[in-house]
């Protein structure tokens, strides 16, 4: 016995002891999680940036990160009023400075009065600062033409993502054939597939129609639901509008049809509406699911369960790092709503600076305020430039042989389809890569352009895409698009 103990001690001294936590012994659901937006291509982009800093010669001088919707990382300037008020909230000593307009000072004082200890450094209640929840409710009422919004149904969150995960946690239950199924659009934002994998739910894919500008077809919802009921219990339907990664904006008629479908099939609706300010195409208009639902009247308005999400990260603000967001729940069971608050309480509260920023987004300067003119000019300039970039992206890609791109009606991305030669597909398979992953890796290595392969979002079999943000400055975007088109032509020739 003593000898055995001595052997173990010697093994420990020599570093031979096995790890308690190993890949084989860790949570298998975590191993199944994939998040393409920050996946292997992005890791390689980071390595290339490091190599460039070290003086390693490359066929390019910089890595262009067109993989993620992070506006300020791509050079967009913050909106002055938002940052002025935040600066005053973070450092109240500045309230006596003549360098800040009076309306910014009043807004900062109002927010600080609602904070514990009159400081952004204090925790808030778990559902968010009450004053800000009330301002969010008033914003929703204005947006939806006066339809009432109850601040008690508004929960602030760490970006929209945190709220989406929380609602999905409430929905997931059962084992085997009774496991919860969630219908998600394909292509989809990988937060959904990653969260469902982590929670052990069943991902139920419904395909958007690329031939009709990524339209949502209720017949396709019926197909997906019918097939899913053989192996799980579908309980929820997610819609992303405007679309990520596909950039489409749903019509009111489509939203009404989706609501009727969800009601008839007893599905909880999740409306991811974080790009509601990002609508560019003539004839396109954002319609909130809440507004359409309420205007449909009974039985839908009083019974269909809905959670709708918004964020400070997108829109004209692009304030990703502050992690501000909210969810409004409609027709949710009161007892379940208390359970949602309990879940949020475990994480204490959303970041208070993010809550403050959200307040400024939902209640911007009024026309009579000193900051209004500058605020409005900056906001419109951002949205006008995004609209120009959306049009340019569509135009350049559709002029390139072997690339086709649907109109970027909204959001911040294009999702072009690329033709890949059979020999390129075979080479990718030899390397154990998805064909579009192979294409995107080669693109990165030869041009420094970082985009995300369509396989990370889901796509119909035999088709290949990539997602690219439209956020780089206009002239840089023009060069990027031309460079990408030339690379595709060269790649096609190489493997023909």
UniProtKB/Swiss-Prot annotation:
- InterPro entries recorded for this chain? ALAT1/2-like, Aminotransferase_I/II_large, PyrdxlP-dep_Trfase, PyrdxlP-dep_Trfase_major, PyrdxlP-dep_Trfase_small
Keyword Disulfide bond in record? no
One GO cellular-component annotation of the UniProt record comes to: cytosol
| Alphabetic keyword roster | Acetylation, Aminotransferase, Cytoplasm, Phosphoprotein, Pyridoxal phosphate, Transferase
- Tell me the residues on which N6-(pyridoxal phosphate)lysine occurs: 314
E.C. number: 2.6.1.2
Its required cofactor(s), as named, are:
pyridoxal 5'-phosphate
Q: Which reaction does it catalyse?
A: L-alanine + 2-oxoglutarate = pyruvate + L-glutamate
For this protein, the parts annotated as crossing the membrane are: none
Quaternary context: Homodimer.
Q: Could you identify this protein by its name? A: Alanine aminotransferase 1
Q: Which organism is it from?
A: Homo sapiens
